[in-house]
Curated annotation (Swiss-Prot):
InterPro entries, per database record: PAPS_reduct_dom, Rossmann-like_a/b/a_fold, SO4_adenylTrfase_ssu, Sulfate_adenylyltrnsfr_sub2
Function: With CysN forms the ATP sulfurylase (ATPS) that catalyzes the adenylation of sulfate producing adenosine 5'-phosphosulfate (APS) and diphosphate, the first enzymatic step in sulfur assimilation pathway. APS synthesis involves the formation of a high-energy phosphoric-sulfuric acid anhydride bond driven by GTP hydrolysis by CysN coupled to ATP hydrolysis by CysD.
Species whose genome carries this gene: Methylorubrum extorquens (strain PA1) (Methylobacterium extorquens)
NCBIfam families in UniProt: CysD (TIGR02039), PRK05253.1 (NF003587), PRK12563.1 (NF009214)
Catalyzed reactions per annotation: sulfate + ATP + H(+) = adenosine 5'-phosphosulfate + diphosphate
Keyword Cell wall biogenesis/degradation: no
Single Gene Ontology BP annotation: sulfate assimilation
Biological or metabolic pathway of the protein: Sulfur metabolism; hydrogen sulfide biosynthesis; sulfite from sulfate: step 1/3
Self-association and partners: Heterodimer composed of CysD, the smaller subunit, and CysN.
Protein name stated in the entry: Sulfate adenylyltransferase subunit 2
């Protein structure tokens, strides 16, 4: 009589493996349903993780969609250098779109303020690009833990013909089943990182050795303190107020955007383990440094309803 064959031990996925598997599943489901998908690439840590997951989802083949960056022309110089370097290293199709009307009118965060700048150079620019290339599914790196309006948005988010989000038209997503049925002109924003936290992102970056913009690591940088924020003076376009002089301080960024609208934090964290340690101890949102989130009550939800990322 032959000996009984032992049943294989049941493999348990780690927390990060479960998140990774869910994100890869979302990518594959969305691409299977999409007619013309695109990935919105904002260059930050979440976009870097999103890109890494997309490459895993479709390996060993090429990405079945391009990356698109909405360039306001006010991103940190290190962000643009990182974007171009990564696209070249990975052989990616990268589309860069800028609202030329806004650029011609000189719309910027300093001259027009954060609300007008964000609307013209981000929201309107994104709607222009989606219409121009006729994308019906746009992947984004938003996470539910970032901000209240993002917390209630579905993984597959229906947008109307003007790319607007209506919270009342959200669809149920039971058992990871996603509804991609749409009317003519409608489209979807898809968020594979919805269930990740800031800590998950940093742990995954460390585990997978994912390249990120150096601005996330602490270094001596020229900053001015304005309205309670440490703003890095990244180029000569930033006007100094009377008596204001940039000071070299040890800072890093928890989140990245247009540099005049993004506050740094004083920190000695120059390695991933140190950043993870700070994240574990943090008692404030990573978006505390985003000036655009302070454009009045419900600012982010209002922006999303107008077509924002």
């Amino acid at each position: 009589m032959s000996a009984a064959v032992a049943a294989p031990a049941r493999t348990r996925l780690t927390h990060l493996q479960r998140l990774e598997a869910e994100s890869i599943h979302i990518f594959r489901e969305a691409v299977a349903e999409a007619e013309n998908p695109v990935m919105l690439y904002s260059i930050g840590k979440d976009s870097s993780v999103l890109l890494h997951l997309a490459l895993k989802a479709f390996a060993p083949g090429r990405l079945p969609f391009p990356l698109m960056h909405i360039d306001t022309t006010w991103k940190f110089r290190e962000m643009i250098a990182f974007r171009d370097r990564r696209a070249k290293e990975l052989g990616l199709e990268l589309i860069v779109h800028t609202n030329q009307d806004g650029l011609a009118k000189g719309v910027g965060p300093v001259s027009h303020g954060s609300e007008v700048h964000t609307d013209v150079m981000k929201t309107q620019a994104l709607r222009q690009a989606l219409d121009k290339y006729k994308y019906d599914v746009a992947f984004g790196g938003a996470r539910r833990d970032e901000e209240a309006s993002r917390a209630k948005e579905r993984i597959v988010s229906l947008r109307n013909g003007q790319h607007r989000w209506d919270p009342k038209r959200q669809r149920a997503e039971p058992w990871h089943l996603y509804n991609f049925k749409k009317r003519r002109g409608e489209s979807f924003r898809v968020f594979p990182l919805s269930n990740w936290t800031e800590l998950d992102i940093w742990l995954y970056i460390e585990q997978e050795n994912i390249p990120i913009v150096p601005l996330y690591f602490a270094a001596e940088r020229p900053v001015v303190e304005r309205d309670g924020q440490l703003i890095m003076v990244d180029d000569e376009r930033f006007p100094l107020e009377p008596g204001e002089t940039p000071q070299q301080r040890q800072v890093r960024f928890r989140t990245l955007g247009c540099y005049p609208l993004t506050g740094a934090v004083e920190s000695p964290a120059a390695t991933l383990p140190e950043i993870i340690g700070e994240t574990l101890a943090a008692r404030t949102s990573e978006r505390q440094g985003r000036v655009i989130d302070k454009d009045g009550a419900g600012a982010m939800e209002r922006k999303k309803q107008e077509g924002y990322f």
